[in-house]
């Protein structure tokens, strides 16, 4: 009874392999700015282990949107990082989010 709050917190699912801080958020609005976070910029904010191991396959991609815990890649304009390195590296290689294409299509 006393641990009701803690039990509710644990009932959401399995523990993620890596937990990102809940306050870690990036926003990228392609309508107002075609600017996207690069791998180097993400490495400044993500835990180094996540950045090195998970972002390596994605060095040609940009990442727009929000970083949230436990969410898979969503849409090209609002995307989120899942919390496990395995699903992060898998998602980024299969993601439709490619800022270089979006930016170049506007300038070419």
UniProtKB/Swiss-Prot annotation:
<feature type="region of interest" description="Disordered">
    <location>
        <begin position="75"/>
        <end position="94"/>
    </location>
</feature>
<feature type="compositionally biased region" description="Low complexity">
    <location>
        <begin position="79"/>
        <end position="94"/>
    </location>
</feature>
<protein>
    <recommendedName>
        <fullName>Uncharacterized protein encoded by LINC01548</fullName>
    </recommendedName>
</protein>
């Amino acid at each position: 009874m006393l641990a009701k709050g803690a039990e509710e917190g644990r009932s959401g699912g399995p523990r993620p392999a890596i937990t990102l801080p809940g306050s870690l958020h990036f926003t990228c609005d392609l309508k107002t700015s075609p600017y996207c976070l690069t791998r180097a910029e993400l490495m400044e904010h993500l835990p180094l282990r996540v950045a090195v191991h998970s972002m390596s396959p994605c060095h040609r991609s940009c990442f727009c949107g929000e970083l949230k815990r436990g969410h898979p890649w969503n849409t090209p304009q609002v995307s989120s990082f899942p919390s496990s390195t395995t699903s992060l590296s898998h998602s980024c290689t299969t993601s439709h989010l490619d800022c270089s294409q979006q930016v170049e299509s506007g300038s070419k």
